[in-house]
Amino acid sequence: MAAISTSIPVISQPQFTAMNEPQCFYNESIAFFYNRSGKHLATEWNTVSKLVMGLGITVCIFIMLANLLVMVAIYVNRRFHFPIYYLMANLAAADFFAGLAYFYLMFNTGPNTRRLTVSTWLLRQGLIDTSLTASVANLLAIAIERHITVFRMQLHTRMSNRRVVVVIVVIWTMAIVMGAIPSVGWNCICDIENCSNMAPLYSDSYLVFWAIFNLVTFVVMVVLYAHIFGYVRQRTMRMSRHSSGPRRNRDTMMSLLKTVVIVLGAFIICWTPGLVLLLLDVCCPQCDVLAYEKFFLLLAEFNSAMNPIIYSYRDKEMSATFRQILCCQRSENPTGPTEGSDRSASSLNHTILAGVHSNDHSVV
């Protein structure tokens, strides 16, 4: 009998059921997970939380309005009915969704987090993961499209509308899957010892995977744009020896350089700190990552606000369409190219092609 009684405590270990399966905590409160991870769960609004929430809501509104303007501009102006602009519109849609996700977060954070259930907390985080993954995937798709276009010496790719739709569907499918993975099982609800400090219901392994996935995507984008720039610079220098307009070539090269620096700089500034913070949360237990979490979250949010400016507002034709929409004006010539856009080669793809075809001043 003594031998039998000593085996009973082994069967009733707190983390395992009688069937030797891990114990799950689906019915626990959010406070339970936050207390275990050591993350402070506010009971009332302090000054910093109010400032962060106010700034976050303001940025969310700007994100939604700016990206809605981009989508409407691409829809109403037939000059933008090309694959690159469809991808830009999809990028705007992803960033618009990011604005909605952050807007939902702002009203379910701070003391309001206590009211969430496990399911609603995972939904809140899943919306953010989905929107941010879609934005990054769209940036990568645009980089690949520009790379193909430049090296084939085309103004626009010959990709059919059907293929563009397939690319967009793949982007959103991947984004939804990435956002849903924690909700369908890759979390720490049944592995309570491996919960993240920053995201108390997320598994450390998932956050490492998600951070590395985005950092690898960033590296691929850097390589693609560096390859584009190197190719255009080489072509420009070669043609300047046989062209009567070397000054134009230098200006085109500098314009491309500025655009690439803005694109890559915005991505680095907005994304890298938060992704590194996720890795530090897992790999550096002594690091106080929670002290910087809210600020880096806002920084990542700013990327969705910058994308319309970087990819669209530098285009003079896009700017003119913005003014027409905001002033409720009708386009005088919705089907043909404008003289201004012909002269300036204002969009990013016009700029790239101008460097390749330095002797051809007609880009349409």
Swiss-Prot record:
Where is this chain primarily localised? other
List of residues binding a 1-acyl-sn-glycero-3-phosphate = 39, 124-129, 210
Any one Gene Ontology biological process term?
A: cell chemotaxis
Phosphoserine occurs at: 341
UniProt entry tagged with the keyword Coiled coil: no
Glycosites: 27, 35
Please indicate the ranges of residues that lie on the Extracellular side. 1-50, 108-121, 185-204, 281-294
Q: Could you tell me which residue ranges are on the Cytoplasmic side of the membrane?
A: 76-83, 145-163, 226-255, 316-364
| Localisation per UniProt entry | Cell surface; Cell membrane; Endosome
TM segments?
51-75, 84-107, 122-144, 164-184, 205-225, 256-280, 295-315
List, alphabetically, the SUPFAM superfamilies matched.
Answer: Family A G protein-coupled receptor-like
Molecular function (GO) terms for this protein are: G protein-coupled receptor activity; G-protein alpha-subunit binding; lysophosphatidic acid binding; lysophosphatidic acid receptor activity; PDZ domain binding
Assembly, per entry:
Interacts with RALA and GRK2. Interacts with GNAQ and GNA13. Interacts with CD14; the interaction is enhanced by exposure to bacterial lipopolysaccharide (LPS).
PANTHER family xref list: G-PROTEIN COUPLED RECEPTOR (PTHR22750)
Which family is it part of?
Belongs to the G-protein coupled receptor 1 family.
Task performed by this protein: Receptor for lysophosphatidic acid (LPA). Plays a role in the reorganization of the actin cytoskeleton, cell migration, differentiation and proliferation, and thereby contributes to the responses to tissue damage and infectious agents. Activates downstream signaling cascades via the G(i)/G(o), G(12)/G(13), and G(q) families of heteromeric G proteins. Signaling inhibits adenylyl cyclase activity and decreases cellular cAMP levels. Signaling triggers an increase of cytoplasmic Ca(2+) levels.
Name of the protein: Lysophosphatidic acid receptor 1
What's the source species for this entry? Homo sapiens
Q: Tell me the gene name.
A: LPAR1
